[in-house]
C-alpha cells in the first residue's frame, strides 16, 4: 500500500472521563466538511443495522456477538482503551444503548488491522449490552462493483458523536484487502462495511487522503478472518 496512506482515527479527538461517554462532548455546533449527497446522518440508531454500531473515542466498531465488538487494532490499542468506554449506537436524537467498560482485547495475530474487543455486559447506566444491540451477520463474500455502505462516527468529537452512513462501490478485492469509494473521514476507522443486505463484508481501516473523492481501504473478511472472529465471540 502507498506509504502516504492515512490511517483514519489514529489521534483521539476527545478524552472520556468517568462521568460517561457522550456527556463530555462539546456543545458547540460542528459539521462534517465536504459531505456529499451519498452521506446521511442516522438520527435514530435503535434499529438494525445501526444498533450494531458502537463508538470508541476516535473510532468505530461493530457488534458481532455476545459482548463482542470488531474494530481495528489501532483503535483498540489507542489512548489506553481500558480507561475509556464504548457507546452503543449513540445518535443525535434516538435513544442510545448505553456506555460500556472494556473487558479485554484480542488482536488478530496477522498483519491485518483487526481486533476483537469484549465489553462488560452491564452499562454504567444499568443497561444490558446484548438487549440493546443487534449482532451483524457475516456476508458469504463480495465482489468488485458490489454496492456497499459504511456506518460510523466520522470526526466523532467534532460532530458530537453523530452517526453517519455513506454509500459507494467496491473497486478492488485482493486477499484480505479491499478498496472502495464510499466517503469516510477520521473516526470511521473500524466502521462496518456492509452489503445491500446489511451483511458484514469487512471493516474500514484507512484512506489515501483528506479529500472525500479519494480511495478508502478495508479489511476484507475472508473465511480465515471470519473463523478468527467467530472463535473469539463470547459464549
From Swiss-Prot:
Keyword Signal in record: yes
Cross-referenced InterPro entries: Peptidase_S1_PA, Peptidase_S1_PA_chymotrypsin, Peptidase_S1B, Peptidase_S1B_tx, Trypsin_dom, V8_his_AS
Record Pfam families: Trypsin
Top EC class, one word: hydrolase
EC assignment: 3.4.21.-
Residues at the catalytic site: 74, 113, 189
Signal peptide bounds: 1-35
GO function terms (MF aspect): serine-type endopeptidase activity
GO biological process: proteolysis
Keywords, sorted A to Z: Hydrolase, Protease, Secreted, Serine protease, Signal
Gene3D superfamilies: Trypsin-like serine proteases (2.40.10.10)
GO cellular component: extracellular region
Keyword Transport: no
Compartments it resides in: Secreted
Family: Belongs to the peptidase S1B family.
Protein name: Serine protease SplA
Amino acid at each position: 500500500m502507498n506509504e502516504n496512506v492515512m490511517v483514519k482515527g489514529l489521534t483521539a479527538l476527545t478524552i472520556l472521563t468517568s462521568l460517561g461517554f457522550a456527556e463530555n462532548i462539546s456543545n458547540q455546533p460542528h459539521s462534517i466538511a465536504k459531505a456529499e449527497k451519498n452521506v446521511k446522518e442516522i438520527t435514530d440508531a435503535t434499529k438494525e443495522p445501526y444498533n450494531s454500531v458502537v463508538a470508541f473515542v476516535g473510532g468505530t466498531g461493530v457488534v458481532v456477538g455476545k459482548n463482542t465488538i470488531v474494530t481495528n487494532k489501532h483503535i483498540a490499542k489507542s489512548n489506553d482503551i481500558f480507561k475509556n468506554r464504548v457507546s452503543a449506537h449513540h445518535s443525535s436524537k434516538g435513544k442510545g444503548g448505553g456506555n460500556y467498560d472494556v473487558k479485554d482485547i484480542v488482536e488478530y495475530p496477522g498483519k491485518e488491522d483487526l481486533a476483537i474487543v469484549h465489553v462488560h455486559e452491564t452499562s454504567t447506566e444499568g443497561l444490558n449490552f446484548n438487549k440493546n444491540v443487534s449482532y451483524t451477520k457475516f456476508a458469504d463474500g463480495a465482489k468488485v462493483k458490489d454496492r456497499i455502505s459504511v456506518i460510523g462516527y466520522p470526526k466523532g468529537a467534532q460532530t458530537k458523536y453523530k452517526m453517519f452512513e455513506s454509500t459507494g462501490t467496491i473497486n478492488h478485492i485482493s486477499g484480505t484487502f479491499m478498496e472502495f469509494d464510499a466517503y469516510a473521514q477520521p473516526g470511521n476507522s473500524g466502521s462496518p462495511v456492509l452489503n445491500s443486505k446489511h451483511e458484514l463484508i469487512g471493516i474500514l481501516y484507512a484512506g489515501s487522503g483528506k479529500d472525500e473523492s479519494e480511495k478508502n481501504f478495508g479489511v476484507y473478511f475472508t473465511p480465515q478472518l471470519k473463523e478468527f472472529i467467530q472463535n473469539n465471540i463470547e459464549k
